[in-house]
Amino acid sequence: MGIDRFIGIDLAWAQSGARTKPNESGVAAIDGHGVVIECGWTRGLDETMSWLAKTAVDGSTLAFVDAPLVVDNPVGQRPCEREVGQRYGRWKVSANSTNQSSPRQAGVLLRERLQESGWAYDDGRGGPPTGGLVFSECYPYTTLVGAAELGYDQERPTYKRRPARVPTARWRAVRAAECARMIGRMEGLTTADPPLLLSSHPGSRQLVSEPSPQKAADYKHLEDLIDALLCAWTAALWSRHGLARCQVLGADSSLPPGQAPTIIAPARPEQRRDRGAR
């Protein structure tokens, strides 16, 4: 047995209203050789579930989702989110707080839909799965600074949030340039273990061949696809190397195996708890 397909979903966290068009979610699927099988966008949970049904390999798929999947805390921040800041704060990476009062619960709804469809949520505390239809939570920022292959040794790339040092008037141009550099680093994963071959699919190839847009809506469109590809590659990294290259944030939960709210995150030695990262 083994996992043959790795899926990444950059999920739009908020639910759409009756009169509101759902926001886009980025979706991507790669195989064990890094070939991009499919990538693009969906709108709403129904489209995302339909895409998964067409893209997953039955009995051999691992999906990583960038969205809170298990939210059991009435207030405050989930422990796994707190640990993001504790372990990766030096690289200027932190996580938004999620609790049962948060309006953005699309990840919880996706988990419920997936479980109803035969998928199994895996909190990662038992190591990588060896088969089945399995999904877990990840956070692309931890991949960017936790995977040494990408070269972000000092701090995260500024492709999302404007740093205070960048004037608002210059932000769109600075962001587009930073995004282009990040795509260049992702293109370098061709020789990584596991690899990611951006040139293997027209959608991901376009990231490399065309300049990053400055217009806000166009940029968000591209950003969602980038994050989905990072999620898929993180799933492949976890499957290939397990705890040797990744850590499970929130692993101290007292919940039964497979039920804890966790984030599976690539980690350098200095980002791990047992190396003084707290």
Predicted regions and their residues:
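RNase H-like (RuvC/DEDD) metal-dependent nuclease/polynucleotide-processing core
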Residues: M1-I7, L11-R278
